[in-house]
UniProtKB/Swiss-Prot annotation:
Pfam families for this protein: NGF, NTF3_N
Signal sequence range: 1-3
SMART domains associated with the record: NGF (SM00140)
Record keyword Secreted present: yes
Protein task: Seems to promote the survival of visceral and proprioceptive sensory neurons.
Gene: NTF3
Name recorded for this polypeptide: Neurotrophin-3
Natural source organism: Loxocemus bicolor
Sugar attachment sites: 106
Keyword terms, alphabetized: Cleavage on pair of basic residues, Glycoprotein, Growth factor, Secreted, Signal
InterPro entries: Cystine-knot_cytokine, Nerve_growth_factor-like, Nerve_growth_factor-rel, Neurotrophin-3, NTF3_N
CC terms in the record's Gene Ontology section: axon; dendrite; extracellular space; synaptic vesicle
Superkingdom classification of source: Eukaryota
Length: 159
């Protein structure tokens, strides 16, 4: 693991994926106590836990942790059907961003055709919608966010 300062400019997508992977592997998200390596008089390294009595001199310093690409290939246990960390850029933007494209807003221009069977690797929504009939629901939330009553029976015609 290497640390660099934040003054290197903007981060690439690969370095951000590496950073997320490293956080998961290092257990930083579990609030583990960081360790420091100290040298003894005979030159041997020992690992010392950092205590609150030792204030960090670099209070404003936030390191960026980068991981070798080989480490990404070795660790497959963090794979998820919803999130894919990859070194390669996706073939097209995620579906949520298609409405922001100027091509979609201008309906007079021709749409680009794509070949069948293209890969959608890495393009999963965070929360997949579920379409199914619900029969035991008495109240619901409409598209404006208001609580509404669900009718159990709809009468048609004159009453």
């Amino acid at each position: 693991i290497q640390s660099t300062s934040m003054d290197q400019g903007s981060l690439s997508e690969d370095s951000m994926n590496s950073f997320i992977r490293t956080l998961i592997q290092a257990g930083i998200w579990k609030n583990k106590v960081p360790k420091q390596t100290a040298r003894t008089k005979d030159g041997m390294q020992t690992t010392v836990k950092k205590t609150e009595a030792e204030p960090d001199v670099r209070l404003g310093f936030q390191p960026i942790v980068s991981v070798d690409a080989e480490l990404l290939r070795q660790q497959r246990r963090f794979s998820s059907p919803r999130v894919l960390l990859s070194e390669n850029t996706p073939l097209e933007p995620p579906p949520l961003y298609l409405m922001e494209e100027p091509m979609v807003l201008n309906r007079t221009s021709r749409r680009k055709r794509f070949a069948e069977g293209k890969s959608h690797r890495g393009e999963y929504s965070v929360c997949d919608s579920e379409s199914r009939w619900v029969t035991d629901k008495s109240s619901a939330v409409d598209i404006r966010g208001h609580q509404v009553t669900v009718l159990g029976e709809i009468r048609m015609g004159p009453s």
